[in-house]
């Protein structure tokens, strides 16, 4: 939808369609090339029309709906288009044969897949993929023991020495792919805080800049990433055409003196007997960092640094579902998550503006943005300025102009520091069995790329063992 009008799709021929919008949509092709492009092929009409009232009688739909255990036709329709439906026609290289809760979840070669290799052999090469679902600790142990064909997610960087030491024993190799994210352990201070006094405090840029200067990122880098990473804010990585070294390095110097002076200047000079600063209402300045076991030992270090400058901080680990529930209800003080796709930040600018429910620093403002002001909380002028710049980016068909406009967004982020970065620049670790072939030595990772989906996984192969 552009300009409040749904797009128009025109069929040109059996293989060509034309998309028309009310206003220019400069990010449309990039979105199609990203994970969002799946939506274009997720609704096979010849199958799903049997479960839609436009094409099937109400009587027939009612019978099918009740037989499937649903109350409404749209519940049946949603169930039939779910990726776990084994009967749903797919263009994927593999189709699902045993969906969750099966263990393992099984995908099998799609005999109708549309790609062939240079010799005319139909792809994919691999006939069957077993996806075993475990907790992160078990995943890491299995990877170290060589019990996984390939693993790219949930590998804990703290296990890096073990991954490297056990390569020969486990019969695997460790690839170091380029990380397209802007950092790890990103701290999103809730600007839509429900406590009005705390909201006023965290809404002051001096508070956020003070907390940034209060952290020793070199210690965080050594403790969590063996010094391999680089202290930085949440900025596009050096491999990105949007890279901005000025924002990357803003306020990252460890300097508690600067932190103290900024907090004093805010009027938070008075402290209690524990050295914790006193709010205007007489209460101590206290915040909680909420995380989903995202390098909690590093966050305990962060809490110590912040407490040392008079902002009492504790860390709370939550189950992912509860974490999401609390942030949706704007109940968190500080939420922690990793980078997204800062390589191409225009596709998902969650860390540069209140863009979506993943913009943990200002979900209330993101609701205002997504609803054109109908919902959520109206943001201050500087954030509205960022939103207006992004709307201009959406309407520009010139990537150089998109980069120029986004630089203005980065400038405003550098000035305001709406989110606080810690460390970034670590490679994405990929553990691959030695019998697993055609996996590139170097690739770019990112959520929008659906990595490793951007590495021609249909060409992966398993070497025969005599």
What are these regions (language model features)?
Residues 1, 28, 142, 201-203, ...:
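Aromatic- and charge-enriched surface segment that lines or borders ligand/interaction sites
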Residues 90, 122-127, 205, 253-288:
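Immediate post-signal peptide segment of exported/extracytoplasmic ligand-binding proteins
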Residues 95-108, 112, 130-196, 218-225, ...:
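Extracellular/periplasmic solute-recognition and catalytic clefts
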């Amino acid at each position: 939808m552009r300009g409040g009008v749904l797009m128009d799709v025109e069929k040109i021929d059996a293989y060509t369609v034309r998309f028309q919008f009310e206003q220019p949509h400069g990010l449309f092709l990039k979105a199609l090339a990203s994970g969002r492009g799946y939506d274009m092929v997720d609704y096979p009409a010849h199958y799903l029309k049997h479960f839609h009232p436009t094409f099937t009688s109400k009587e027939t739909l009612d019978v099918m709906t009740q037989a499937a255990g649903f109350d409404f036709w749209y519940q049946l329709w949603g169930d039939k288009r779910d990726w776990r439906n084994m009967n749903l026609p797919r263009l994927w290289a593999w189709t699902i044969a045993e969906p969750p809760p099966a263990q393992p979840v099984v995908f099998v070669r799609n005999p109708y897949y549309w790609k062939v290799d240079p010799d005319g052999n139909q792809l994919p090469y691999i006939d069957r993929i077993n996806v075993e679902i475990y907790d992160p600790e078990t995943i890491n142990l299995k990877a170290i023991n060589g019990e996984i064909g390939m693993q790219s997610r949930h590998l804990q960087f703290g296990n890096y020495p073990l991954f490297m030491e056990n390569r020969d024993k486990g019969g695997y190799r460790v690839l170091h792919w380029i990380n397209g994210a802007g950092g790890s352990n990103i701290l999103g201070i809730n600007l839509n805080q429900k406590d009005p006094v705390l909201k006023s405090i965290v809404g002051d840029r001096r508070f956020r800049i003070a907390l940034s200067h209060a952290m020793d990122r070199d210690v965080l880098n050594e403790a969590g990433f063996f010094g391999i990473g680089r202290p930085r804010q949440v900025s596009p990585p050096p491999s990105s055409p949007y890279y901005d070294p000025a924002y990357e390095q803003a306020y990252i110097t460890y300097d508690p003196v600067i932190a103290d002076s900024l907090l004093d200047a805010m009027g938070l000079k008075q402290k209690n007997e524990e050295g914790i600063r006193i709010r205007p209402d007489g209460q101590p300045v206290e915040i909680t960092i909420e995380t989903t076991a995202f390098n909690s030992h590093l966050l305990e270090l962060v809490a110590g640094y912040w407490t040392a400058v008079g902002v009492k901080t504790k860390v709370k680990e939550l189950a992912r579902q509860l974490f999401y529930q609390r942030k949706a209800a704007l109940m968190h003080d500080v939420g922690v998550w990793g980078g997204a796709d800062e390589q191409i930040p225009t596709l998902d600018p969650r860390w540069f503006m209140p863009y979506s429910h993943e913009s943990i620093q200002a979900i209330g403002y993101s609701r205002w943005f997504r609803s054109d002001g109908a919902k959520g909380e109206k943001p201050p002028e500087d954030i509205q300025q960022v939103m207006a710049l992004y709307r201009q980016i959406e309407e520009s068909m010139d990537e150089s102009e998109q980069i120029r406009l986004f630089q203005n967004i980065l400038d405003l982020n550098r000035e305001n520091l709406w989110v606080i970065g810690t460390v970034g620049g670590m490679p994405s670790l990929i553990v691959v069995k030695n019998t697993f072939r055609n996996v590139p030595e170097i690739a770019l990772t990112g959520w929008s790329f659906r990595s490793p989906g951007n590495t021609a996984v249909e060409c992966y192969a398993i070497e025969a063992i005599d």
